Regions:
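Short, glycine/polar-rich helix-capping loops at beta-to-alpha or helix-loop-helix junctions
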Residues: 156-168
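Short, well-ordered beta-strand core segments
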Residues: 127, 153, 170-173
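Short beta->alpha connector loops at strand-helix junctions that form conserved
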Residues: 94, 131, 157, 172-180
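Glycine-rich, small/polar surface segments that engage phosphate groups of diverse ligands
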Residues: 23, 47-121
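Generic N-terminal amphipathic, Lys/Arg-enriched alpha-helix
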Residues: 2-35
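Short glycine/serine/threonine-rich phosphate/pyrophosphate-binding segments
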Residues: 66-71, 135-142, 164
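A charged, well-structured terminal subsegment
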Residues: 119, 181-205
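A short, well-structured juxtamembrane/interface segment
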Residues: 33-54
C-alpha cells in the first residue's frame, strides 16, 4: 500500500485507488476481533459503564480526525446508539473554542485538554484518549492529569506501542497502515463500546 493509503494507481485510473482502499479498510475491520480483541473492548466498556452507573462521566479528547471521533462518540452516549434510554454524561473536550483558545494562549497547546480534565474530571470518571500515534503531547498530559485525579483512562491507538499505553488502564490498538484506516477502526470500536454500555446499563448490571 502506498504512503497515502490508497495503493498505486493502475493505468492512471482514479477508480483503482478506491478498489485498493476498500479491501484494506475491510481488512482492518476484520482484524479488530483479534487486536485489540473482544475482551479488551469489553474491559474498556465496563469502565465506562461503571462510571456512568455511579453518576460519573466520560470525557473524550483527540486532535484532528481524532477530535472528530471524540465528538462522534460523546454524541452517541448523550444521544443514543441503539436503545431508547436516558442520556449519559459524556463530554468531548474538543468543542469549546473559547476554552481551547484561552488555554492555548495562556498555557500553550499542550495544556488544552489537561486543563479541562483538571476542571471537569472527578475520581471515578473515565477519559477516552484518542491518538493514532499515542504521542500527542496534549493527549498525554490529559491522560496524566486524569490518572492523578483518580480517573480511569481508555486509549484508542494505532498499531505501535507508545507513551500513551503507559497511562492507560486499557489500551486498544488498531492495526492500520495509515491514520485514516486506524480512525475507521476507532469508530468501529467506539460503536461496539457504546452499544455494550447501553445494553449493560439497560439491564441494570
Amino acid at each position: 500500500m502506498s504512503p497515502e493509503g490508497f495503493g498505486e494507481p493502475q493505468g492512471g485510473a482514479p477508480m483503482s485507488q478506491i478498489a485498493n482502499y476498500l479491501p484494506d479498510s475491510a481488512k482492518v475491520a476484520a482484524s479488530l476481533a483479534e487486536r485489540p480483541g473482544v475482551a479488551a473492548v469489553e474491559r474498556a466498556a465496563a469502565l465506562v459503564a461503571d462510571a456512568l452507573a455511579g453518576g460519573g462521566q466520560v470525557l473524550f479528547c483527540g486532535n484532528g480526525g481524532s477530535a472528530a471521533d471524540a465528538q462522534h462518540l460523546a454524541a452517541e452516549l448523550v444521544g443514543r446508539l441503539l436503545l431508547e434510554r436516558p442520556a449519559y454524561r459524556a463530554v468531548a473536550l474538543t468543542t469549546d473554542t473559547s476554552v481551547l483558545t484561552a488555554v492555548g494562549n495562556d498555557y500553550g497547546y499542550a495544556e488544552v485538554f489537561a486543563r479541562q480534565v483538571e476542571g471537569l474530571g472527578r475520581p471515578g470518571d473515565v477519559l477516552v484518549a484518542i491518538s493514532t500515534s499515542g504521542r500527542s503531547e496534549n493527549v498525554l498530559r490529559a491522560a496524566a492529569t486524569a490518572r492523578a485525579r483518580g480517573m480511569a483512562v481508555v486509549a484508542l491507538l494505532g498499531p505501535a506501542a507508545s507513551p500513551l499505553d503507559e497511562a492507560a488502564e486499557v489500551a486498544l490498538h488498531v492495526d492500520g497502515d495509515v491514520a485514516g484506516l486506524v480512525q475507521q477502526g476507532h469508530i468501529t470500536i467506539g460503536h461496539a463500546l457504546c452499544g455494550w454500555v447501553e445494553q449493560r446499563l439497560a439491564a441494570g448490571r
